[in-house]
Amino acid sequence: MLLHIPNVLSPEEVRYFRDRLEDAEWTDGRVTAGEQSAKAKLNLQIPQDSAECRELGEFVLRALGRNPTFNSAALPLRVYPPLFNRYDTGMHFDAHVDNAIRPIPGAGMRIRTDVSSTLFLTGPDEYDGGELVIQDTYGTQSVKLPAGDMVLYPSTSLHSVNRITRGSRWASFFWSQSMVRDDTKRRLLYEFDCSIIETRKALPDSHPAVLGLTSTYHNLLRQWAEL
């Protein structure tokens, strides 16, 4: 499932991120890539252990915590500490699949990457090229979103970032280990949850239809979740 989530960050929050990142040290982005992906990758990142990355990463995690769409769609068990990248003119990332398992630095644990996320920090008018191109079961999708918006997609997807021909594209990116590893089951649960929300707009929570749908949703989640 590929999902666009608008307004994860407000315009004021995006400006704060941009100001902090302007002052950050940027290094070669290949340091976080696997051996094969590193050969396809040409971009910049701020170091994962930098004060800016830690502060802004915590900010992103708080924004995710208050976003019901992200939590319904990703059903996150663990979220990898958000990273920040930058593509200047001429930079790109050729087609690749994200590493299946990633160690969390300093945490003594690893996560399975089920859901990939890109949170855009520059608007589409600030650069040419730079589309996130995702190949999924419904074909090839080209994504270029407003600043503050985010896209979710299965980490199993082959994806790339087109070469930048003007300007600079900034973003935060991270992975989630979902309580439900199978993308089809996650999509069904998300659609089920959306249907419950719409039903509750028309019927009281005590209505048998609402109670029945809610009960079935939670029983399916109980059946499929891995903790």
UniProtKB/Swiss-Prot annotation:
Q: Which UniProt keywords apply?
A: Dioxygenase, Iron, Metal-binding, Oxidoreductase, Vitamin C
Q: Which residues form the Fe2OG dioxygenase domain?
A: 78-178
Q: Where are the transmembrane segments?
A: none
Q: Where does Fe cation bind?
A: H96, D98, H159
Which enzyme class? oxidoreductase
Q: How is the cofactor bound?
A: Binds 1 Fe(2+) ion per subunit.
Annotated residues for binding of 2-oxoglutarate: R169
Documented EC number(s) = 1.14.11.-
Q: Which GO terms describe its molecular function?
A: 2-oxoglutarate-dependent dioxygenase activity; iron ion binding; L-ascorbic acid binding
Q: Which cofactor does this sequence's record say it needs?
A: Fe(2+); L-ascorbate
Biological-process GO terms, alphabetical: DNA damage response; intracellular iron ion homeostasis
Name assigned to this protein: PKHD-type hydroxylase GOX0559
- UniProt organism field: Gluconobacter oxydans (strain 621H) (Gluconobacter suboxydans)
